[in-house]
């Protein structure tokens, strides 16, 4: 796919839950939760140094090819995914977030902020008043 991109000067929009493969096809990765971008950045930054708790959960869910680790417990995002028709107000991930901050996450929608060069996150953990 990279060869096709270069040869024909085209772009791909690769939509997946498999963040492990996304890093190989992408110049940038945008992680979305219930229709909102919650993290955006270069593939290595997003996959090796994720910022948002949901991105961290996606990466932790990637199966490890080492057979010795096949029985390793993987963290699971708590709770049930919300109804996409009736999304939670403010931070959409707050009902399931292990880092939930009452009075912040449930009261204010986090802005997408640049935390590192070209690496953005929408999370109160990285807000100006965090």
Language-model segments: which ranges?
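P-loop NTP-binding/switch modules centered on Walker-like glycine-rich loops
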Residues: 1-72
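Charged, flexible cofactor/metal-binding loops and thiol motifs
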Residues: 43-130
